[in-house]
Swiss-Prot record:
Name of the protein described by the UniProt record: UPF0246 protein GFO_2679
Cellular-component GO terms for this entry: cytosol
Domain of life per record: Bacteria
GO terms of biological process kind: response to hydroperoxide
HAMAP family assigned: UPF0246
Family per record: Belongs to the UPF0246 family.
Length: 253
């Protein structure tokens, strides 16, 4: 079983790490090429490219200038501990027991505009580059062109034909994977909440739930779709009634 999640724009490079382990990203050479192009952009160009404030443009301009091809424990941090958004609140990675790290490293993959795809312990440097950004290299017009073939082939090389591919990434990041060419069966869970008497997807809760489900799969060592349907973190429950497609199981609360 493989799980994919989105990265986060919010980063944490301050908290004490629970492990000294760190691995090298698969596509570091491509990431370095992207950074070289980004480092040539002005602050105004970065602001326009990413639709961010001048303050954030200043921060990321500095990040791209300081980016180093050599990723080590002094200038980088394992991805699972560096990302700090809603998904990672649900995943709660700092509390994952160290004896579960091998399982985590084998099972979870993080899609990334800068690095393509990351294992949890892959070292990354601070960056901001959303997958939907209109910037490309290698004669590609955007990041989907840069990454889709690379990421899909990478994931296929890791998977068996009978494996489940649990898609917990956002639509923006899911498009970086050509799911039609993936081995195995793609499962895309949906999380809905009752609000004002109506069942709907609420973005903040859905993001956190994706992280919680990834944590559940690691904690419970899930191997089958039935195992996944047992997801009950944060009071969610699988709903047969609201599930119209078995590959898109709906969880409600």
């Amino acid at each position: 079983m493989k799980i994919v999640v989105s990265p986060a724009k919010t980063l944490d490079y301050e908290s004490k790490l629970p492990t000294t382990r760190g691995t090298q990203p698969e596509f570091l050479e491509t990431a370095s090429k992207l950074n070289r192009k980004l480092s040539r952009q002005s602050k105004k160009e970065l602001s326009d490219l990413m639709s961010i404030s001048d303050k954030l443009a200043d921060l990321n301009y500095t990040r791209y200038q300081e980016f180093q091809e050599d990723h080590n424990k002094k200038n980088s941090r394992p991805a699972i501990y560096a990302f700090n958004g809603d998904v990672y609140t649900g995943l709660d990675s700092y509390t994952i027991p160290t004896d579960k790290l091998d399982k985590l490293q084998d099972t979870l993959r993080i899609l990334s505009g800068m690095y393509g795809v990351l294992r949890p312990l892959d070292l990354i440097q601070p960056y901001r580059l959303e997958m939907g950004s209109s910037i490309g290299i290698e004669r590609k017009k955007d990041l989907y062109g840069v990454w889709q073939k690379k990421v899909t082939e990478y994931l296929n090389a890791e998977m068996e034909d009978d494996e489940f591919f649990i898609n917990l990434a956002s639509n923006e990041y899911s498009k970086a994977v050509d799911t039609k060419k993936l081995k195995g069966t793609v499962i895309s869970p949906v999380f809905k909440d009752f609000k004002n008497g109506k069942l709907k997807i609420i973005s903040f809760f859905a993001k956190k739930a994706r992280g919680s489900m990834a944590r559940f799969i690691i904690d419970k060592d899930c191997k089958t779709l039935e195992d996944i349907k047992g997801f009950d973190y944060d009071d969610y429950r699988f709903s047969e009634e609201y599930t119209e497609n078995e590959n898109e199981p709906v969880f409600i609360r």
